[in-house]
Regions:
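Domain-scale recognition of functional cores that engage charged ligands
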Residues: 1-281
Length: 282
């Protein structure tokens, strides 16, 4: 909540032009990657209406003047990717994909994916369509990756992080595992594999049976889990903030984003499919 307060205070004294420029910057980036095509030939590939980032995807599409599309509305032909609406077919030059790497194309990655578009990666490889962000960039979604972010800031920027992050530590590290076993009530345990998510276990509210089951699962395969410190009750918290950035002719990140309610370890809630649980912060 402290972060939100600071953002609101700054918005009262600073121009809102930066936020108004968000759509132009991101649309320009889509046009740049689409080899000069109009933003109308861009779609935001969304897995389904009931996914945790639906509001973010909807906001992103509206901002850049694109349409939210699901895999069932797209087809891959010898000429590229087309959006099918009744008898109308629209050629798509850029796909802003909001689908995880492994689910993007069932013919290339996981064959059981129901939200991916068959042959999409082949069309991308042949230069028939551009994918933003490209396959492989999903590595940043791995929860244990967040523990590297502060060190990356220090190493590449020579600065200290401006804001602390809710660090996820890999349970495969012996010291992390030992602390979890000694005092499970202090931590939350989440899966490290975004392809196989499971409901997190919060040690302070878990039953004895749930705690023992969680510890047993972590011992059997520690690589699959990460540990997070539970935030103290007195710690100011309330929202997880997700910002948008674009890399077209230059890098741009506006002073706004999507906020959603936090859980007790700083992680976002599991779903934000209504207007109550998601909000615009600018």
């Amino acid at each position: 909540m402290e972060l939100l307060t600071r953002l609101v205070d700054r918005s009262r004294t600073e121009s809102v032009a930066a936020i108004n420029d968000l759509g132009r910057w991101m649309a320009d980036a889509a046009v740049t990657y689409g080899r000069g095509s109009e933003a109308s030939s861009t779609v935001v590939l969304d897995p389904c209406r009931y996914n945790p980032t639906f509001r973010e995807n909807e906001f992103l599409a509206r901002t850049i003047g694109a349409q939210v599309a699901h895999a069932g509305e797209l087809v891959v032909s010898k000429d590229g990717v087309e959006l099918v609406s009744g008898i109308k077919r629209t050629k798509i030059t850029t796909i802003v994909r909001r689908v995880d790497d492994d689910l993007l194309d069932p013919n290339c990655f996981r064959p059981d994916s129901l939200v991916g578009l068959p042959e999409l990666c082949k069309a991308w490889k042949n230069g028939l369509v551009n994918i933003v962000n490209p396959p492989g960039s999903g590595v940043a979604s791995i929860r244990s990756f967040t523990q590297l972010v502060p060190e990356m800031i220090r190493e590449f920027l020579g600065e200290e992080p401006a804001l602390p992050v809710a660090v996820s530590r890999a349970c495969s590290a012996p010291d992390v595992m030992q602390k979890l076993i000694e005092n499970p009530a202090r931590f939350a345990v989440r899966t490290n594999d975004q392809m196989h998510p499971a409901r997190p276990c919060f040690g302070d509210s878990a039953t004895k049976a749930e705690t023992l089951s969680m510890l047993d699962a972590v011992r059997r395969d520690p690589e699959k889990f990460v540990r997070r410190d539970l935030l103290p009750v007195s710690e100011p918290r309330g929202f997880n903030l997700r910002v948008f950035s674009s890399m077209g002719k230059g890098f741009y990140m506006p002073r706004c984003g999507i906020g959603r309610h936090c859980q007790s370890d700083g992680g976002a809630t599991l779903a934000i499919n209504d207007d109550v649980s998601a909000c615009f912060v600018g």
